[in-house]
């Protein structure tokens, strides 16, 4: 038995060495194709002019850190979740609260609006994803109509509806992502490949096919085929946890934000990292990233309470937005691109335009 164990260890060790050498060869092949930098290609592009954005609305009502938020497709309503165990639906025009749900646990780390605008999903330390239908009847008990959809073996870190209300994609601290049927709660596909907690995910724009990207504590960003459950591309250039990933509007690239204080842009067709957004003066991690509708700007929320706005093509910072009094934890551009909303550990959300 002992010799069997030795053989197994030797086999594992040799496989690890082989995997590393193959990785090295892959990197060499990638490097051969790496003939030009994005900022060199963008040299002829005109620089962006004066950039001004201000806080237009402040949403107050959470009793603790805001951890996640999402826009409704109607471009008006926002759902947010917090460490106080509450999930609130806001009217961003009037700052009124339209619905509130108290979850059975605190640390509600994930929330999402259904494409129809008729339901929300949320979850966190309860290890599951719950879906609540939204009605116009203010007296109706939303909790009574709750559906428990997804069950993980560790905390839920992110969730997102697919292009319909019928399926939901989740990411978890158990190192997996999963696709679920909302009606039956059945697991449709699971995605294994991360070596540590998965912290974030984003679905490819609907025109570009059935893929999504995830990032986690293993410093890897992975692109998955939702039909096969296979990882089709992986990128490992960050030096710390990846907190946020977001597809470029065309679906041909994605950005990531990490605790290593950088944001990076990966081109899926070139199969490599094409830009790094960083400055020596930025020493705090990036918690959340999102693109403007055109894809020219990258908004990034940081743990130093600021939001930095980057010129995607030139790699230069075009603005810093101040206002939050604690770390920015979540950030999303509205569906029509006219504004974006940020959530913070200072218990508030801010709408900027």
UniProtKB/Swiss-Prot annotation:
Where is the major localization of this protein? membrane
Q: Which GO terms describe its molecular function?
A: G-protein gamma-subunit binding; protein-folding chaperone binding
Q: Where in the cell is it found?
A: Membrane
Q: Where are the WD repeats?
A: 61-100, 103-142, 151-192, 194-236, 237-276, 278-320, 323-352
Q: Which Pfam families match?
A: WD40_Gbeta
Q: Name one GO cellular component term.
A: plasma membrane
Print the keywords alphabetically.
Membrane, Repeat, Transducer, WD repeat
One GO BP annotation is: negative regulation of voltage-gated calcium channel activity
Q: Which Gene3D superfamilies match?
A: YVTN repeat-like/Quinoprotein amine dehydrogenase
- Give the record's family classification: Belongs to the WD repeat G protein beta family.
* The protein's assembly and partners: Component of a complex composed of RGS9 (isoform RGS9-1), GNB5 and RGS9BP; within this complex, the presence of GNB5 stabilizes both itself and RGS9 and increases RGS9 GTPase-activating protein (GAP) activity. Interacts with RGS7, forming the RGS7-GNB5 complex; within this complex, the presence of GNB5 increases RGS7 GTPase-activating protein (GAP) activity. Interacts with GPR158; promotes the GTPase activator activity of the RGS7-GNB5 complex in absence of glycine, in contrast GTPase activator activity of the RGS7-GNB5 complex is inhibited in presence of glycine. Interacts with RGS6.
Role: Enhances GTPase-activating protein (GAP) activity of regulator of G protein signaling (RGS) proteins, such as RGS7 and RGS9, hence involved in the termination of the signaling initiated by the G protein coupled receptors (GPCRs) by accelerating the GTP hydrolysis on the G-alpha subunits, thereby promoting their inactivation. Increases RGS7 GTPase-activating protein (GAP) activity, thereby regulating mood and cognition. Increases RGS9 GTPase-activating protein (GAP) activity, hence contributes to the deactivation of G protein signaling initiated by D(2) dopamine receptors.
Name this protein carries in UniProt: Guanine nucleotide-binding protein subunit beta-5
**The organism of origin for this protein:** Oryctolagus cuniculus (Rabbit)
Organism ancestry: Eukaryota, Metazoa, Chordata, Craniata, Vertebrata
């Amino acid at each position: 038995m002992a010799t069997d164990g030795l053989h197994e260890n030797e086999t594992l060790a040799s496989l690890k060495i082989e995997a590393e050498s193959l990785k090295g060869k892959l990197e060499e092949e990638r490097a051969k194709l790496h003939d030009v930098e994005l900022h060199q290609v963008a040299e002829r592009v005109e620089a962006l002019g004066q950039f001004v954005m201000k806080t237009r609305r402040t949403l107050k009502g959470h009793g603790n850190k805001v951890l996640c938020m999402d826009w409704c497709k109607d471009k008006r309503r926002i759902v947010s979740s917090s460490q106080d165990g509450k999930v609130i639906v806001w009217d961003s025009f009037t700052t009124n609260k339209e619905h509130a749900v108290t979850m059975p646990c605190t640390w509600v780390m994930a929330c999402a609006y259904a494409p129809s605008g008729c339901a929300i999903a949320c979850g966190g330390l309860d290890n599951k994803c719950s879906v609540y239908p939204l009605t116009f009847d203010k007296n109706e008990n939303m909790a009574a109509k709750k559906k428990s959809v997804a069950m993980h073996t560790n905390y839920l870190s992110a969730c997102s509806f697919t292009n319909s209300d019928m399926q939901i994609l989740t990411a978890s601290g158990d190192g997996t992502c999963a696709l679920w049927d909302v009606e039956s709660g059945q697991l449709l596909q699971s995605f294994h490949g991360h070596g540590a907690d998965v912290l974030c995910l984003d679905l490819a724009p609907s025109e570009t096919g059935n893929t999504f990207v995830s990032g986690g504590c293993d410093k890897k960003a992975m692109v998955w085929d939702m039909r096969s459950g296979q990882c089709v591309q992986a990128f490992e250039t960050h030096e710390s946890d990846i907190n946020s990933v977001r597809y470029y509007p065309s679906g041909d690239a994605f950005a990531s934000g990490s605790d290593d204080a950088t944001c990076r842009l990966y081109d899926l067709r070139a199969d490599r990292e094409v830009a790094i957004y960083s400055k020596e003066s930025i020493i705090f991690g990036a918690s959340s990233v999102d693109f403007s509708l055109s894809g020219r700007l990258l908004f990034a929320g940081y743990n130093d309470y600021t939001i930095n706005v980057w010129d995607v093509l030139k790699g230069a910072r075009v603005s810093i937005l101040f206002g939050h009094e604690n770390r920015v934890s979540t950030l999303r551009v509205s569906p029509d691109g006219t504004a974006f909303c940020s959530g913070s550990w200072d218990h508030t959300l801010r709408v900027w335009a």
